[in-house]
A protein has these predicted regions:
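Pyridoxal 5′-phosphate
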Residues: 1-463
């Protein structure tokens, strides 16, 4: 029996004006819907970014008034860093911003050439998508490092953490892993892998948290990550990527020298010099930057970035923090980080309930196969047999994935297609040997039981 008593889905649906077009959107894995507060914030940010910021009086020795001529757009950069820091349990000065996590991981891999030389190793995993695989493969090939692979359990899609005790060695320079697979939904024991990495090497542990960001309370320290990557779009925000570093000390270690001056000038145009750094007594002073942070931004924050888009980052994290209500139906109170901790588990439980309905329904349809939830002899696994996020993929015997997708679309249900070459994990699991692809169902907090029933009726009509 599906129980949503602790999550006010009608209220949450009202936060998405895009749902009024009549479509059932189950493609959150690739194209999440934007809440109205995010689109409104972006619109206001584009209008206000070039305007001069008002001059406020200076109060106290540890603060400084804005300089004359400061634009409002510069505050959007600062608020975006603060929002990402709240989302992952970090400090704003540890946040690097870019156009996407793919671009940022690319830049990170290129900038670590001194670590990826001959004799060093890079450890990658099959559960990651291309954003956290391809940049490291290119960098390893260019600079001479060897690549080692962590393999998934091909029956479930889970990435076992125990294998890293053999894969990681003193020569390991980088270990990159996804916190969850975006198509199958299986969650990786990142903390266990992180403990192994730090115990056996001085390698950098890079975690792609993109798939778990809409559902899990992320804490970079608990995960043991040195660098954490995500796209704000995955939580219903604008197309902005972020890298979050564990500490300023790590930033200084990874970037001991500034890049070429031309890169420094490009980064300066993005406003890298305007943020927070330790002041007298360890307190923060506005307008200054720790040298290690500045060097990291000069290396990674290349080119310009729309301050209008940055204006929607804080609204996206606020939306995530305000999804759930307390027992009386009132919004949760406290800091944004506290509201994330209190509300996200309730939202995740609700979406898990919908995902269980989808899995149970597909298991009851002849010829339907839910990837990672069936054994060798087509016995069905329980949805909760492994830790997962509410994402799943399936295929139908004898029916091309494009045809399934088209039938769903004709019935008003929007899903995603995973073609051959788009998923290393599905390739290893043999999905593309028996099918032309798979259909990915990306559930979100705005979906309903009615949406699930509509999906299942459309799939059933194919047989």
């Amino acid at each position: 029996m599906f129980d949503n008593a602790r999550f006010d889905n009608p209220r949450v649906r009202g936060l998405y004006t895009s749902l009024s077009d009549g479509w059932v959107y189950m493609n959150a894995a690739t194209d999440p819907q934007l809440p109205e507060r995010v689109s409104g914030a972006v619109s206001r940010a584009f209008r206000s970014a070039p305007l001069a910021a008002p001059i406020e009086e200076n109060h106290g020795e540890h603060s400084r008034a804005a300089s004359p001529g400061t634009r409002i757009g510069e505050s959007h950069i600062k608020s975006a860093r603060v929002a990402i820091a709240d989302l992952v349990g970090a400090r704003p000065e540890h946040v690097i911003l870019g156009s996407s996590r793919t671009q940022l991981i690319n830049q990170l891999a290129e900038s670590l050439s001194h670590r990826l030389r001959l004799g060093r190793q890079v450890v990658l995993s099959r559960v990651d998508d291309g954003a956290n695989i391809d940049p490291w493969l290119r960098a390893a090939d260019l600079y001479g490092a060897d690549v080692r692979w962590a393999e998934a359990d091909l029956s479930t899609g889970v990435l076992p953490a125990w294998q890293y005790t053999e894969l990681v060695s003193p020569e390991t320079a980088v270990v990159a892993v996804a916190a969850a697979n975006e198509h199958v939904g299986t969650v990786t024991d990142v903390a266990a892998i992180g403990r192994t990495v730090h115990a056996k090497s001085d390698g950098i542990f890079v975690v792609d948290a993109n798939a778990v960001a809409p559902f899990h309370v992320i804490d970079i320290a608990d995960l043991g990550a040195d660098v954490l990557a995500l796209d704000v779009a995955t939580i219903g925000g604008p197309s902005i990527g972020a890298l979050v570093f564990r500490s300023v000390e790590l930033m200084g270690e990874l970037f001991p020298h500034p890049p070429r001056q031309s890169r420094a000038r490009a980064a300066a145009r993005f406003g890298a010099h305007k943020d927070v750094a330790p002041g007298p007594g360890g307190l923060a002073l506005r307008g200054a930057v720790h040298p290690s942070v500045e060097r990291a931004r000069e290396w990674l924050e290349l080119g310009g970035l729309s301050e209008g888009l940055l204006g929607g980052v804080s609204a996206a994290v606020d939306h995530l923090a305000d999804l759930a209500s307390d027992a009386e139906g009132d919004s949760l109170r406290g800091t944004r980080r506290r509201r994330l901790r209190g509300g996200l588990p309730l939202a995740e439980d609700y979406v898990h309930g919908l995902a269980r309905m989808v899995v149970d329904g597909l298991h009851g349809l002849p010829g339907a196969h839910v990837i990672g939830l069936e054994g060798e002899y087509e016995e069905h696994f329980d949805y909760d047999s492994v830790e997962r996020i509410p994402r799943l993929s399936f295929f139908i015997d004898g029916v091309p994935a494009e045809a399934v997708h088209a039938r769903l679309f004709a019935q008003g249900v929007v899903t995603s297609v995973i073609p051959p070459g788009d998923s290393e994990l599905l390739e290893q699991m043999g999905v593309f040997e028996s099918s032309t692809g798979a259909v990915c169902v990306g559930l979100s907090v705005h979906n309903t039981v009615g949406d699930v029933n509509r999906l299942l009726r459309a799939v059933a009509s194919l047989r």
